[in-house]
């Protein structure tokens, strides 16, 4: 585990290492574009997992599919695909639809449902108005 932890911290500056290795609660990362925020976030998740953290108790949200995909790939390379798959990680939409599907039945709703986009909604309204 020590070698893996060293590999996770390798290449990070002292502030980034401090953020990655702080596992006693949440950390707020505020930095400009291209400063390594995504690298810090993915390294921190890998660091927590390597220290025995439960992947299903980690939530990582991003705005774009591209960023989510990059984060998943980076973490899978650091800790393995099996652990990475168990994370709640992705865009706001993808993560929360996963929550809805996973827990809908326990709330008395079916887990099979469709979310309409604008076009679908307009089409449904037009059908109802006929």
Predicted regions mapped to residue ranges:
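P-loop NTPase Walker
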Residues: 1-110, 115
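Coupling/switch/interface segments within P-loop NTPase motor domains and analogous charged loops
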Residues: 119-130
């Amino acid at each position: 585990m020590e070698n893996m932890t060293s590999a996770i911290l390798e290449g990070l500056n002292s502030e980034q290492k401090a953020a990655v290795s702080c596992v006693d609660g949440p950390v707020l990362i505020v930095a400009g574009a291209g400063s390594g925020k995504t690298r810090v976030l993915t390294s921190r998740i890998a660091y927590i997992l390597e220290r025995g953290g439960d992947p299903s108790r980690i939530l990582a949200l991003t705005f774009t599919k591209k960023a989510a995909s990059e984060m998943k790939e980076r973490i899978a390379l650091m800790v393995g695909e099996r652990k990475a798959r168990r994370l709640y990680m992705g865009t706001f939409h993808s993560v929360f639809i996963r929550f809805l599907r996973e827990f809908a039945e326990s709330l008395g709703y079916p887990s099979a449902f469709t979310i309409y986009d604008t076009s679908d909604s307009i089409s449904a309204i037009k059908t109802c108005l006929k």
